[in-house]
């Protein structure tokens, strides 16, 4: 099916029950791009001989060189199900042709923001797990994100060729390995999912249902239990009964699948299935999965890899595999690939699993609407999204910008959730800060062109109905990173994406030649557009700062900046880590600040959060948008807050959502509401730039104890109150034992047993500590988990490899913030050095400001 045209795709786009939007997610190097190849070659864009080597979706040169995926890439595939297979689909369908929009996403944790962007526009996910190394830290992170977005997972066990050829596992051991991975994945799903009673129903994966695939992307073969069940049903049917109708056949195959997994055994002597492991005459019976599925595969591997010519010929005939003339002369691995690919083609198995088990937009948008849309659940836009209605108002979410071949321009890449987007349509382009009824962050502009994304190429298309993924030309000037596009006047925004990592590593950049500064500024703007997570900031000292998730992420960003966006040579500083400011005790005095005109007084105290509250705010368990009483109850039950105080939270900060809280515990103050906005503004300002070195604050609760105000409104305006509030907040921080917090990575290291000692050495030198060490069952590999300060992580990978002879593979994920031990006021301590360096870098006055600047006497 190589030559399917845009018109054919366009025809299927209207059959929204036959669309599947899915992404491929996994831990780094578990083989996503390689697997995607077998799908692409099935839908016919790569020649099948090259599949497994081309990595079609790795479109950039550096992706091909480093052999990693950096940006998520979209591609549309067409697949036709046979009459027999259609009966397995439990949701509504429309004809036998399916359009699959597939997004291949990166596995490196540094690029997990790309994964988030991919997940937002898809409804299903193919989770790839390497069956040798099992479920890793990044598998868990991306799976958790997928479930939080209400995306249905199916599992693929990749790299079976390694299990057979390198580890030489027995069938029973291999079954146990699979069983363990399935259990691990289901534990993650049930931990973060909403249970069977939730809106999605049961999303646990189960080989019996056919939601688990097994195979090898590199060799291009794969199967689910369905393929083997069909072979055996056909075999048994051939013995006795005549032809079955498609519906009865589907029923028989489903029954058969139940027998092929779990504690079911097969007696080859009688040809019967049994539930006990021993036959009536006391022989030990083989498990059905091992006997009926793994055994034939092992036989093929054994015959071909040991060059048993006659046996190979017999097997090929028995399995009814038709080889090309050129394949017949091969031997060893090339022959193995050719045979397995003919017998169990990966494309078919995976595409069937995707079309049968992943939801169509019609199914998925019913339960995803409430998570996607911020507005009321019953306005026109929400109804359009829920029913995926092409006649409804246009609602579209742009999840990222894709650079075009033309420097400096971007395609806006996103998904149409309701309505129809077409060339020349006049739309409302709403950025993430838009609020209905206001004019800011809103543009009314026509769309210049709509295009289809096909991996490395784009195809122009007239219009695209809802449920599809599309690229737009001509809206990139009006959006940074993400936004909502709609034709409905009262539409609210689609919800902003939550990233699982935060940009904690920063680098200062400058142009080598000062005359190139304007190009650098322009380049930074483009960089901020092209990557969903990177932040570009200008410090007060005039420095340009780029913040990213980690070393690798920053390295790629800087390379892009130099070569694509700014096209000028760049100097960069050493990487610096962002810190947070916090307090460790309650303020020792009640802090008083007077306004500049001496007529208003504010009294406040600061105190630290109880453990875990800041993390809850980050996750969104406690947020500014929650229902008041519900939030108060949660705080009272979990953190033992006073209920009356918990109800009087004024706001969160910085930016209205951060992990600091301002509460009002005053008793009967007149005119208090009039100054609330001013105090809140001062609070946002103070929490964004803390007292120690103007870093964000974290985990501080401020209590307003008392306020005395001037009777005339004119003497208590914003100009009087905002700076006063800020001074008072600073004073309460400085009297509450202020501390610095540093970001900590969770490092997962895979290594053979003999080098574990070397790892401990490296970690101890870098202030890290190991908190878990486990052996991967059935292999000689160890997994070491440790906490490592981000500050010490630069060059960690190189250091680790040189100390372990290149046998250890680390994965760093940002995990939490931790207080840096020591007092910033003590000149010999580590925090005071950090404060001094940071203040110097930002061009602030030397030394922490004295308390007298903020605290007033009565």
From Swiss-Prot:
Subcellular location: Cytoplasm; Nucleus
Post-translational modification: Phosphorylation by EF-2 kinase completely inactivates EF-2; it requires prior phosphorylation by CDK2 at Ser-595 during mitotic prometaphase. Phosphorylation by CSK promotes SUMOylation, proteolytic cleavage, and nuclear translocation if the C-terminal fragment. Diphthamide is 2-[3-carboxyamido-3-(trimethyl-ammonio)propyl]histidine.
Residues marked Cleavage (site): 586-587, 605-606
InterPro entries: EFG_II (IPR041095), EFG_III/V (IPR035647), EFG_V-like (IPR000640), EFTu-like_2 (IPR004161), G_TR_CS (IPR031157), P-loop_NTPase (IPR027417), Ribosomal_Su5_D2-typ_SF (IPR020568), Ribsml_uS5_D2-typ_fold_subgr (IPR014721)
Modified residues (Phosphothreonine): 54, 57, 59, 435
Chief location bin: cytoplasm
Binding site for GTP: 26-33, 158-161, 216-218
Enzyme Commission code: 3.6.5.-
GO cellular component: aggresome; cytoplasm; cytosol; nucleus; plasma membrane; ribonucleoprotein complex; ribosome; synapse
Disulfide feature: none
Glycyl lysine isopeptide (Lys-Gly) (interchain with G-Cter in SUMO) cross-link site: 322, 529
Modified-residue entries (N6-acetyllysine), positions: 235, 239, 272, 275, 439, 445, 619
Chain positions found as Diphthamide: 715
Phosphoserine found at: 325, 502, 595
Molecular-function annotations in GO: GTP binding; GTPase activity; lncRNA binding; protein kinase binding; ribosome binding; translation elongation factor activity
SUPFAM superfamilies recorded: EF-G C-terminal domain-like, P-loop containing nucleoside triphosphate hydrolases, Ribosomal protein S5 domain 2-like, Translation proteins
The protein's assembly and partners: Binds to 80S ribosomes. Actively translating ribosomes show mutually exclusive binding of eIF5a (EIF5A or EIF5A2) and EEF2/eEF2. Interacts with SERBP1; interaction sequesters EEF2/eEF2 at the A-site of the ribosome, thereby blocking the interaction sites of the mRNA-tRNA complex, promoting ribosome stabilization and hibernation. Interacts with HABP4; interaction takes place at the A-site of hibernating ribosomes and promotes ribosome stabilization. Component of the mRNA surveillance SURF complex, at least composed of ERF1, ERF3 (ERF3A or ERF3B), EEF2, UPF1/RENT1, SMG1, SMG8 and SMG9.
Biological function: Catalyzes the GTP-dependent ribosomal translocation step during translation elongation. During this step, the ribosome changes from the pre-translocational (PRE) to the post-translocational (POST) state as the newly formed A-site-bound peptidyl-tRNA and P-site-bound deacylated tRNA move to the P and E sites, respectively. Catalyzes the coordinated movement of the two tRNA molecules, the mRNA and conformational changes in the ribosome.
Protein name: Elongation factor 2
Gene: EEF2
């Amino acid at each position: 099916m190589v030559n399917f045209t845009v018109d054919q795709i366009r025809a299927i786009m209207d059959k929204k029950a036959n669309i599947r939007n899915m992404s491929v997610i996994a831990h780094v190097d578990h083989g996503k791009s390689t697997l995607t190849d077998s799908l692409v070659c099935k839908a016919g864009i790569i020649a099948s001989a090259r599949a497994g080597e081309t990595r079609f979706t790795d479109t950039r040169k550096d992706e091909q060189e480093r052999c990693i995926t950096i940006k998520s890439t979209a591609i549309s595939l067409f697949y036709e199900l046979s009459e027999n297979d259609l009966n397995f689909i439990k949701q509504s369908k429309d004809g036998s042709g399916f359009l699959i929009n597939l997004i291949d996403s990166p596995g490196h944790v540094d690029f997990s923001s790309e994964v988030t962007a991919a997940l937002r526009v898809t409804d299903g996910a193919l989770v790839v797990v390497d069956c040798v190394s099992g479920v890793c830290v990044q598998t868990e992170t991306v799976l958790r994100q997928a479930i939080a977005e209400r995306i249905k997972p199916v599992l693929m066990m990749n790299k079976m060729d390694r299990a057979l050829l390198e580890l030489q596992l027995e069938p029973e051991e291999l079954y146990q390995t699979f069983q363990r991975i399935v259990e691990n994945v289901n534990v993650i799903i049930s931990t973060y999912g909403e249970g069977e009673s939730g809106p999605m129903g049961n999303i646990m994966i189960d080989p019996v249902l056919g939601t688990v695939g097994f195979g090898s992307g590199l060799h291009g073969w794969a199967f689910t239990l369905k393929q083997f069940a069909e072979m055996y049903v056909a075999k048994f049917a051939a013995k006795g009964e005549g032809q079955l109708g498609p519906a009865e056949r589907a029923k028989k195959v489903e029954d058969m699948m139940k027998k092929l997994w779990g504690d079911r055994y097969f007696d080859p002597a009688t040809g019967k299935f049994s539930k006990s492991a021993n036959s009536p005459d006391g022989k030990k019976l083989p498990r059905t999965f091992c006997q009926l599925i793994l055994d034939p595969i092992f036989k093929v591997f054994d015959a071909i890899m040991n060059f048993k010519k006659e046996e190979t010929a017999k097997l090929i005939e028995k399995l009814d595999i038709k080889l090309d003339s050129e394949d017949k002369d091969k031997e060893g691995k090339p022959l193995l690939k050719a045979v397995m690919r003919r017998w169990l083609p990966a494309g078919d198995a995976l595409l069937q699993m995707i079309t049968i088990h992943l939801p169509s937009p019609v199914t998925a948008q019913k339960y995803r609407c409430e998570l996607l849309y911020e507005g009321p659940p019953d306005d026109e836009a929400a109804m359009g999204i829920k029913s995926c209605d092409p006649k409804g108002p246009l609602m579209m979410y742009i999840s990222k910008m894709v650079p075009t071949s033309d420097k400096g321009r971007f395609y806006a890449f996103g998904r149409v959730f309701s309505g129809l987007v077409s060339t020349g349509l006049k739309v409302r382009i709403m950025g993430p800060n838009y609020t209905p009824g206001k004019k800011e962050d809103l543009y009314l502009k026509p769309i210049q062109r709509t295009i289809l994304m096909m991996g490395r190429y784009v195809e122009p298309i007239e219009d695209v109905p809802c449920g599809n993924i599309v690229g737009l030309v001509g809206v990139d000037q009006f959006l940074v990173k993400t936004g909502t596009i709609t034709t409905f006047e009262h539409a609210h925004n689609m919800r902003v994406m939550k990233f699982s990592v935060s940009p904690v590593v920063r680098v200062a950049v400058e142009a080598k030649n000062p005359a190139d500064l304007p190009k650098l500024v322009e380049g930074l703007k483009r960089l901020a557009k092209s990557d969903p997570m990177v932040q570009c900031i200008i410090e007060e000292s005039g420095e340009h700062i780029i913040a990213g998730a980690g070393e690798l992420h920053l390295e790629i960003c800087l390379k892009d900046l130099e070569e694509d966006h700014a096209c000028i040579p760049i100097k960069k500083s050493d990487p610096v880590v962002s810190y947070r400011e916090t307090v460790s005790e309650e303020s020792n005095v009640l802090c008083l600040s007077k306004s500049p005109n001496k007529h208003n007084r504010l009294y406040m105290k600061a105190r630290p959060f109880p453990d875990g509250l800041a993390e809850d705010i980050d996750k969104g368990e406690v947020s500014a948008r929650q229902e008041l009483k519900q939030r108060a109850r949660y705080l009272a039950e979990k953190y033992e807050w006073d209920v009356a105080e918990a109800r009087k939270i004024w706001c969160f900060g910085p930016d209205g959502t951060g992990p600091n809280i301002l509460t009002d515990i005053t008793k009967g103050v007149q005119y208090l509401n009039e100054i609330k906005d001013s105090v809140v503004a001062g609070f946002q300002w103070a929490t964004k730039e803390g007292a120690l070195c103007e870093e964000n604050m974290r985990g501080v609760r401020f209590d307003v104890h008392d306020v005395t105000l001037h009777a005339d409104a004119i003497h208590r305006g914003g100009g009087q109150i905002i700076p006063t509030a800020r001074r008072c907040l600073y004073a309460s921080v400085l009297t509450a034992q202020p501390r610095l917090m540093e970001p900590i990575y969770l490092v997962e290291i895979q290594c053979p047993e003999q080098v574990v000692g070397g790892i401990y050495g490296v970690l101890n030198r870098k202030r890290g500590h190991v908190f878990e060490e486990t052996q991967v069952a059935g292999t000689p590999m160890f997994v070491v988990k440790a906490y490592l300060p981000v500050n010490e992580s630069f060059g960690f990978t190189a250091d680790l490899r040189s100390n372990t002879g290149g046998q250890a593979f680390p994965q760093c994920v940002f995990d939490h913030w931790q207080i840096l031990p020591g007092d910033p006021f003590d000149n010999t301590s580590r925090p005071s050095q950090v404060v001094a360096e940071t203040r110097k870098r930002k061009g602030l006055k030397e030394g922490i400001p004295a308390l007298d600047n903020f605290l007033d006497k009565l």
